[in-house]
Each structure stands twice: as structure tokens, then as C-alpha cells.
Amino acid sequence: MLSPTFIELGAKKVVGCAIYTSGTQTDFPNIWDVFIKRLKDIPNVLNPTVNYAVEFYGQEFMNESKWFYMPCVEVSSFDEIPMIMVAKSIPAARYAVFKHVGIVSGIPDLYSRIYKEWLPSSGFELAFDFDMELYDERFTEMDDPESIMEI
């Protein structure tokens, strides 16, 4: 059984690149490549060693099984958002955090277990229409079985 940790997270401002996707395998590496190349253009980055990926599930997800996937970094302000980039505010809240250790191809299985097993039996409900992935110094490579990321 999955057992998340719970954290109180303050509000965050994030800036990054977004793609509208149905989850095809090439979409994620492609948008990460674009984001990494443009990362140096983002001003006011709070911690350049921490990246996020935010997945926004709107009505499109229910109707078309598509969502917006956004690799991003936290910034101190939205004063200067580079062209073709997107800015989003992440609200302060108590979040359930799930750790993934292993290669990135195992991440979809963790999502499936969170939404199909843990959430229905947890007594919790989704507060927002997004989830967030954290990639910090513990994440080394996509194919490293020791890599760590959090959802």
C-alpha cells in the first residue's frame, strides 16, 4: 500500500514551457528539451537546481484524455516572463507527497496506483485540478534505477 508523506507547501509562482498532450512517450522528453534550452532565459529563479513539472487537468482531460504538462522552475515574481513561456500560481495547501525511486518509465505506474488505489481508499479528495512533480539533486538520470523524484 502506498503511504505518502504530507507537507504544508507555501504558494509558489512557476514559469516554464507547456505542451497539450495525451501522454505520448515523445511529448515529455521533447518539452523538457525545449524547457532546458530556455531555462537560462527565465529571470528571478529561486533555486536553479530544483525543477518541477505541473500537470493541469481541466475539462479537456475528462472529454479528450488530454492535459497540459509544464516543466518549470519557481520564481520570485512574474515581472518578466520570457516569450513562449507560461506562468502559473500554485496555491498554498497541505499536499500528499509520493516518492518514486527508479527509471522514469515507472512514473506512470505510480500515478495509476495513486489515483486508482490510494486516493479512493484514503478518505481524501482532490483539492485542485493539477499535480506536481519535483526534480531536485536526487534525480540523476532518466534511466538511473537510483534516481528519486516526488509527485
Each language-model region and where it sits:
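A solvent-exposed interaction/effector surface
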Residues: M1-I151
